[in-house]
Regions:
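Short hydrophobic/Thr-rich beta-strand motif most characteristic of the beta2 strand and flanking loop
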Residues: 27-35, 43, 194
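Acidic catalytic/metal-coordinating carboxylates
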Residues: 36-39, 62-65
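Receiver (REC) domain active-site loop signature in two-component systems and cognate sites
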Residues: 56-58
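Short, flexible helix-to-coil linker/hinge segments that flank and couple to helix-turn-helix
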Residues: 89-96, 101-152, 156, 209-210
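Helix-turn-helix DNA-binding segment
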Residues: 144-179
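Basic, Lys/Arg-enriched C-terminal extension of HTH/homeodomain DNA-binding domains
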Residues: 189-211
Length: 211
């Protein structure tokens, strides 16, 4: 059985690199590519794939939103998230959102192949580091950093603010009102125990949540 894969990443060089890695396997084929979240949804509506390899940080709609919509439409379609973010910052969030596995872009090529085969077989793929974190219950609220207590939307807005985007830009990007984004901002500051955008940005940089 050949595993049909949809690769979703906004960087052409990354997609080409992934195709080169998978080209050497006898049981996988890259059946389609997508450069943004909407393309991902369009392609899974029109065709059937065995695994989606999804970059969580593409332009446009939030990768978490795309993941949730994809899973609501095809709940049994395995999704392996491939991300530049360290797994201790983002993996638990995407797994809770429905991802079947999480891999950083710094991982070895063999890890990618192993992960695809594992999620295709119906299992979850996580690293040994993350498995230990889950096993010891370090995701419990008391031990989690403040940003992990935010909702997915709050987290998304926080990262956008920390990246220097204005409330208007974030509202346009998420198709929400300026008032709604301002409400999210106030809620984020309260939950994080911070006073302004500068403190949020400093925190996000310290915790490697933004570039």
């Amino acid at each position: 059985m050949i595993i049909k894969i949809l690769i979703a990443d906004d960087h052409t060089i990354v997609r080409e690199g992934l195709k080169q890695i998978l080209m050497d396997t006898s049981d996988m084929v890259v059946a389609a590519e997508a450069a943004n979240g909407q393309e991902v949804l369009d392609k899974i509506w029109k065709d059937d794939f065995d695994v989606v390899v999804l970059d969580i940080a593409m332009p446009g709609r939030s990768g978490l939103d795309i993941l949730k919509e994809l899973k609501s439409f095809k709940p049994r379609l395995p999704v392996l998230v491939l991300s530049m973010y360290p797994e201790d910052q983002y993996a638990l969030r995407v797994l809770r959102a429905g991802a079947d596995g999480y891999l950083t872009k710094e991982s070895a090529p063999n890890d990618l192949i192993t992960a695809i085969r594992k999620v295709y077989s119906g299992k979850k793929y996580i690293s040994n580091f993350l498995a230990e974190k889950l096993a010891f219950g370090l995701e419990a609220d008391a031990a989690r950093p403040p940003h992990e207590l935010l909702s997915d939307r709050e987290y998304q807005v926080m990262c956008s603010i920390s990246s220097g985007k204005t409330v208007k830009e974030i509202a346009d990007e998420l198709s929400l009102s300026v008032k709604t984004i301002s409400t999210y901002r106030a809620r984020i500051l309260e939950k994080m125990g911070m006073k302004n955008n500068a403190e949020l940005t400093h925190y996000s940089i310290q915790n490697h949540l933004v570039d």
